[in-house]
């Protein structure tokens, strides 16, 4: 089956990078948010993977604003904005085994 036969919303693009690009505080907030079980909670777009997080950036019209409301750091939000501005991504996979992206701030926690 050719990829051009799928509806536009069926295809996802993403980037995987190291969790070193987020702070320890961001890690704590993402862990808590990804484990919410209420209907329409953050657990529907922030997913814990065991070694990081999968963030569905297309779940909200302004995902960075939602990350700010959750209390994530400017560095984390800057990472998301930078990646979204340079690449047409719908998913961000932050993973402990992910690559460190050049030119992006890192944290040793």
Give residue spans per PLM region:
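Short secondary-structure capping micro-motifs at structural edges
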Residues: 3, 40-43, 77-81
